[in-house]
């Protein structure tokens, strides 16, 4: 079990997709760079219905690229207490 969880605050998210493009896990999907969201479930996050959604928490490496890319602070890593 990871010591952190990627949390999205949908009320803040504008669905710009900056986080999706910045994620190194998502980068392996060519459609990410074409301006489309990845269709595979083998990604960490994607935009669905105008809001970023965590698709696969287990793939998140905790690098924080998505957090840095978000202009509205809609994403954060929440560290779990032991």
Swiss-Prot record:
PROSITE patterns: 4FE4S_FER_1, 4FE4S_FER_2
Cofactor(s) for this UniProt protein: [4Fe-4S] cluster
Gene Ontology molecular function, alphabetical: 4 iron, 4 sulfur cluster binding; metal ion binding; oxidoreductase activity
Record keywords, A-Z: 4Fe-4S, Iron, Iron-sulfur, Metal-binding, Repeat
Pfam family, one: Fer4_7
SUPFAM superfamilies on file: 4Fe-4S ferredoxins (SSF54862)
Official protein name in the record: Polyferredoxin protein FwdG
């Amino acid at each position: 079990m990871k010591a952190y969880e990627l949390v999205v605050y949908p009320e803040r998210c504008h669905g710009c997709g900056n986080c999706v493009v910045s994620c190194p896990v998502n980068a392996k999907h060519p459609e990410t760079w074409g301006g489309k969201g990845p269709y595979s479930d083998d990604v960490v996050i994607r935009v669905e219905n105008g809001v970023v959604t965590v698709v696969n928490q287990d793939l998140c490496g905790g690098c924080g690229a998505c957090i840095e890319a978000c202009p509205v602070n809609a994403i954060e890593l929440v560290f779990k207490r032991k």
